[in-house]
Amino acid sequence: MPKVALYNQTGSQVGEIDLADSVFGIEPNSAVLYDAIVMQQASQRQGTHDVKNRSEVRGGGRKPWRQKGTGRARQGSIRSPQWKGGGVVFGPTPRKYGYKLNRKVRRLALKSALSTKVQNNELLVLEALNFAAPKTKEMTAVLSSLKVDRKVLIVTSEYDQNVALASRNIPGTKIVDAAGINVLDLVAHDKVIVTREAVAKVEEVLA
């Protein structure tokens, strides 16, 4: 069972916390991690690309010249694909790129990402994280006391407006609640700070 240090907001270690082996201590599955990341990135694509085919381009209803007798190749429309300004053949059309993975696969990917962070000493657990007012300098002080100076993902048990507002002006810092934790965010950030209550919620869902 993985055991990590427990810190307070001033950066002092106040104890240790045991993490669920089935969530934070598994052997990471890189193939499943890859599948989950690709799925998430695909779901984020807009898919609004569009071009006009020959039926959608304005004009071209009249035959440009008669069928026979001109010596030129026969043409039926000035909007045929071979004409300048004509329609596009097999061009992109609006579509949804998103797809789904099985629930077991998604959960395994999330466990793999969390276990990787623990194994690399990139996961910090806070006793609690709350501010009386949404002050950026307070969040900066917390990160500084924990010696976090790179991209960091902060996971709280539930949405806290003061914490969210205090961190939004800090580059490379993102706040999610325990229900919104995902593989892409975990992989994209160098450090992950999780509150003790958030750990309990994550273990409740994934264990």
Swiss-Prot record:
Entry's Gene Ontology BP terms: translation
UniProt entry keywords in alphabetical sequence: Ribonucleoprotein, Ribosomal protein, RNA-binding, rRNA-binding
| Gene Ontology terms for molecular function | rRNA binding; structural constituent of ribosome
Q: Does the keyword rRNA-binding apply?
A: yes
By its UniProt entry, which InterPro entries does this protein fall under? Ribosomal_uL4, Ribosomal_uL4-like, Ribosomal_uL4_dom_sf
Superkingdom, according to UniProt?
A: Bacteria
Q: Does the keyword Acetylation apply?
A: no
| Gene3D superfamilies for this protein | 3.40.1370.10
One GO cellular component term of this record is: ribosome
Identify its protein family.
Belongs to the universal ribosomal protein uL4 family.
Assembly and binders: Part of the 50S ribosomal subunit.
For this entry, the protein name equals Large ribosomal subunit protein uL4
Lineage from the top down? Bacteria, Bacillati, Bacillota, Bacilli, Bacillales
Q: What's the encoding gene here? A: rplD
